[in-house]
Swiss-Prot record:
Oligomeric form and interacting partners: Homodimer which binds Holliday junction (HJ) DNA. The HJ becomes 2-fold symmetrical on binding to RuvC with unstacked arms; it has a different conformation from HJ DNA in complex with RuvA. In the full resolvosome a probable DNA-RuvA(4)-RuvB(12)-RuvC(2) complex forms which resolves the HJ.
Catalytic residues (UniProt): D8, E67, D139
Predominant location: cytoplasm
Magnesium is among the record's keywords: yes
Protein name, per record: Crossover junction endodeoxyribonuclease RuvC
Organism annotation: Haemophilus ducreyi (strain 35000HP / ATCC 700724)
InterPro entries in the cross-refs: RNaseH-like_sf (IPR012337), RNaseH_sf (IPR036397), X-over_junc_endoDNase_Mg_BS (IPR020563), X-over_junc_endoDNase_RuvC (IPR002176)
């Protein structure tokens, strides 16, 4: 029953969403946004790191999923987004969490069935999928959508891994099988 932390990075607002996966069932654990008021970028990055670290400490996730960088029209915005992503990833790595990245289009496709869905469509579907009584804030809904996408990826990868190795039973074995399936092209090396 892995706990998944999804992050929607931003240099002003970083959304987060935490779910627990129990087979095909998803349980909502929490969500919100790290709001950053600092004007200088180094202070904003420090705030993101502290916020993500606090969330990790509070919820003790097993996995960390984050949106990949997309090509923005404004190079300065893309650089700031990349720095915010990197800061959140460092917080996860410092807590020994495996990091998984997903393209925004794949996240939208997974949650709504439409790769070009807008934020409100994602928010509506996340609310329905997790059976929430109220809609989460938009950035939190995006983060939850990233976590949901990772949960679906786990489910698919475990089916494939178990077909190849029926003896997989423990949570650690499942995570290692998932990572080996995802990174089998040699981009990353796994210990153990």
């Amino acid at each position: 029953m892995p706990i998944i932390l999804g992050i929607d990075p931003g240099s002003r607002i970083t959304g987060y969403g935490i779910i627990r996966q129990q087979g095909r069932q998803l349980e909502y654990l929490g969500s919100g946004a790290i709001r950053i008021n600092a004007s200088d970028l180094p202070s904003r990055l420090k705030h993101i790191y502290a916020g993500v670290t606090e969330i990790i400490t509070q919820f003790q996730p097993d996995m960390f999923a984050i949106e990949q960088v997309f090509m923005a029209k404004n190079a300065d915005s893309a650089l700031k987004l990349g720095q915010a992503r990197g800061t959140a990833i460092v917080a996860a790595v410092n807590h020994d969490l495996p990091v998984f990245e997903y393209a925004a289009r794949l996240v939208k496709q997974t949650v709504t069935g439409i790769g070009s869905a807008d934020k409100l469509q994602v928010q509506d579907m996340v609310t329905r999928m997790l059976q929430l009584s109220a809609k989460p804030q938009v950035d939190a809904a995006d983060a939850l959508a990233i976590a949901i996408t990772h949960a679906h990826s786990i489910q698919h990868s475990l089916i494939v891994a178990k077909q190849n190795n029926p003896s997989i039973t423990t949570h650690k074995e499942q995570i290692l099988a998932l990572m080996k399936t995802r990174y089998s092209r040699g981009r990353f090396r796994l210990k153990g």
